[in-house]
Amino acid sequence: MEKIIEIQDIVKNYQIGSVIVRALRSVSVDIRKNEYVAIMGPSGSGKSTLMNLLGCLDTPTSGTYILNGTDVSKMEDDYLAEIRNKEIGFVFQTFNLLPRYTALENVMLPLIYAGVGKVERERMAIEALEKVGLSDRMDHKPNELSGGQRQRVAIARALVNKPSIILADEPTGNLDSKTSIDIMGLLNDIHSNGNTVILVTHEEDIAKYAARIIRLFDGEISQDVLNKDFSYN
């Protein structure tokens, strides 16, 4: 399968006062199209930094990041924003929904940024909400939805632009165990439909849903293994 992510010798340093924090130390990893990967690690391991780089929310201090054939390592913010909107669908722990907007309006937002016309973006947003089982909640605002329903809206928003990658950061962190299982089942379905899914988590039970598990420790990859319990649907 063709590579969608190629990271080579990535270093990320932060300067805090007079101290240099080495968040990532020469990290190299490839991810192929339609892979389902979990990135794990304790607090301070560098997993959040790696997620920010993978999501084009930040750029490395040094090293190379090729995303779907494009070198994004040294891109300026405006270009990174275009790449993000085109290539990556984000699912966050805190949902990041706008409280005054309905579910449908929240899902349409990436399409507005992409310049999609009103009729077409409404059609695409309705289709995305139907895929996550929320066809009867489109006109509800976030405070009228359960936590699981809010996360489904967030997943619909992530899918609506038909991105190359779904990047899920602790997607079940604010959910109870039953709702977490439902949401992970939905991510499994998304992967089965051909999407590349990258899951950032500290929970072993959640990481087991992925086909491959990458563990970070002190800014380095300490383990990169296939999940023997993973089964393709």
Language model feature labels by segment:
Residues E220-N233:
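Conserved beta-strand-loop-alpha-helix hinge in the C-terminal portion
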Residues E2-L216:
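ABC family nucleotide-binding domain
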